[in-house]
Structure formats: structure tokens, C-alpha cells
Amino acid sequence: RIAERIRTERLSILAIPTSLEIRMTCAQLGIPVTSLFSHKPDWTFDGADEVDSHFNLIKGRGGAMFKEKLLISSSPQTYILVDPSKKVERLGAKFPIPIEIFPEALTYVEDRLQRLNPGEIKLRMGQGKDGPIITENGNMILDVWMDYIPENTESTLKSITGVLESGLFMNYKVEVLGLTS
């Protein structure tokens, strides 16, 4: 609908894509793009893999959680659009926490993560290609299942040397839309 409004109503916007896939989609739809180098966002909208009753999120199945977190942190207002199936009683119920790591830190990070007593840690592997998924930042992704995610988990993960970012979004100021059918 945004692309249609740009064409029909001469709506003037610039999108700041968080991935090459979104950048390509914007190009196909005729939505002009920019970057955080050039513009500060007025607002952000995105989706989520899971959302709890406190509007904490798990994001990152697409592997762009570093750029997503950077954009959300840079925005005065963030809207998260989800359908009711994304609502969970506790984060981690349906999806693991994705963690973007520097490749050479893999063994070290896995060792440090084991101290958090996760249910499972898996290196995200490519489908239709050999080897692990490599993010646009040149890093790998560990998917970490946890039965319980304490409030300090995001900062604990971020404090591990070799972790660039996680897909855990705790206590961000977001407005979640679409939870009711």
C-alpha cells in the first residue's frame, strides 16, 4: 500500500531497509531508500517472531537483528506489526534467540552460552547451500533455545566477547499492532 500511495498521492517517504532483501523489495516497488548515514528515522515499523505480554520481542529469523536493533534504537517511535500467532506466554516458546557472532569466536561464544544453561545451541545452517548462514555483516548466527529468559539476558548476551547482537528485544519502547484478530 505504501508504494501505491507514493504513486497515487505523491506520498514523500524514504525507507531505511535493514537487509538487502528489503532494499531489493523497495526498489521493485519504487519506494525510495536511504540509510542511517544520511537520515534519522521519524519512525520505524517492523515485524517480530514472538511478542510477550510486556511487548518484549524475539526477532531475527531473517538474520538482520543488528540493523533492526540499530534502527529501532535510532527511532523516536517504533511500531511492530504482528498477527495473533506471534503472541506467546513467554519468550522462547516457539523460536530460539538468534545471536549474531563473529565467526572466529564461535567456540568461545558457545562455551560462554553453555554457562547460561540453554536448552540447545545450534549454528544456523544454510538451506540449499553448504555451510552456515552468513549475515550481511559477514558473521554467523547461533540459535539458542532457553526455557527461561531472565530480564537481564539481553545485556548478558551482549557482554560476551564475539557477540555482535542478539534478536532479543527487552524493554524497548514499541507499540505492537495486530495482536487481536
Predicted feature descriptions by range:
Residues 15-21:
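Catalytic nucleophile loop
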Residues 21-181:
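Conserved phosphate- and dinucleotide-binding cores of soluble alpha/beta proteins
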Residues 1-6:
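Glycine-rich N-terminal segment of FAD-binding domains in flavoprotein oxidoreductases
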Residues 9-15, 56:
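Short active-site oxyanion
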